[in-house]
């Protein structure tokens, strides 16, 4: 998936799921399941419930995404 094809949205982490998956509520109210990007995993960036994150969504499946940034 090329970067141009993805949709980036802001959201809040609602719940932590097994295998570094998270339930994220987007700004528009939709709830998606998201996993951590490889660079965040590599640098041991922790994500907790309530964190504000940036999620990349693919236009093909809007129910799954990738967390690419955690706001401070």
Swiss-Prot record:
Intracellular or extracellular location(s): Cytoplasm
**Pfam families found in the cross-reference section:** eIF-1a
Q: Which stretches make up the S1-like domain?
A: 1-72
Q: Which Gene Ontology terms cover its molecular function? A: ribosome binding; rRNA binding; translation initiation factor activity
Q: Which InterPro entries match?
A: NA-bd_OB-fold, RNA-binding_domain_S1_IF1, S1_domain, TIF_IF1
Name the domain of life.
Answer: Bacteria
Q: Which PROSITE patterns does this chain map to? A: S1_IF1_TYPE
Keyword set, alphabetical order: Cytoplasm, Initiation factor, Protein biosynthesis, RNA-binding, rRNA-binding
Q: Name the GO cellular-component terms.
A: cytosol
Matches recorded under SUPFAM superfamilies: Nucleic acid-binding proteins
Member of which family? Answer: Belongs to the IF-1 family.
Subunit structure and binding partners = Component of the 30S ribosomal translation pre-initiation complex which assembles on the 30S ribosome in the order IF-2 and IF-3, IF-1 and N-formylmethionyl-tRNA(fMet); mRNA recruitment can occur at any time during PIC assembly.
Q: What does this gene product do?
A: One of the essential components for the initiation of protein synthesis. Stabilizes the binding of IF-2 and IF-3 on the 30S subunit to which N-formylmethionyl-tRNA(fMet) subsequently binds. Helps modulate mRNA selection, yielding the 30S pre-initiation complex (PIC). Upon addition of the 50S ribosomal subunit IF-1, IF-2 and IF-3 are released leaving the mature 70S translation initiation complex.
**The protein, known as:** Translation initiation factor IF-1
Which species does the entry assign this protein to? Idiomarina loihiensis (strain ATCC BAA-735 / DSM 15497 / L2-TR)
Could you read off the lineage of the organism from its UniProt record? Bacteria, Pseudomonadati, Pseudomonadota, Gammaproteobacteria, Alteromonadales
């Amino acid at each position: 998936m090329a970067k141009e094809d993805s949709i980036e949205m802001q959201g809040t982490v609602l719940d932590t799921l097994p295998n570094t998956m998270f339930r994220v509520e987007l700004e528009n109210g939709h709830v998606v399941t998201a996993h951590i990007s490889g660079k965040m995993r590599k640098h041991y960036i922790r994500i907790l419930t309530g964190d504000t994150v940036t999620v990349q969504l693919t236009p093909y499946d809007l129910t799954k995404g990738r967390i690419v940034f955690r706001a401070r």
